[in-house]
């Protein structure tokens, strides 16, 4: 059976947790247009990593076959 290809865009955006059972992602809305956003929103709400929702996890795992 041939090797499976990894979707490189997904590989840059997602990584597994320490146990490997769940997938971590970065939160959105923190790239540009930050002047009008409050520092609370930027620092407290958007700085932490988030888990990929279980409904989307299957699709992410299909894009990353060796994760």
UniProtKB/Swiss-Prot annotation:
Alphabetical list of HAMAP family matching this protein: Ribosomal_bL35 (MF_00514)
Ribonucleoprotein is among the record's keywords: yes
Lineage of the species this protein comes from: Bacteria, Bacillati, Cyanobacteriota, Cyanophyceae, Synechococcales
Keyword Ribosomal protein: yes
Similarity-based family: Belongs to the bacterial ribosomal protein bL35 family.
Organism: Synechocystis sp. (strain ATCC 27184 / PCC 6803 / Kazusa)
Record key words, sorted: Ribonucleoprotein, Ribosomal protein
One GO cellular component term noted in the UniProt record for this chain: cytosolic large ribosomal subunit
Protein name: Large ribosomal subunit protein bL35
Biological processes annotated in GO: translation
Sample GO molecular function, one term: structural constituent of ribosome
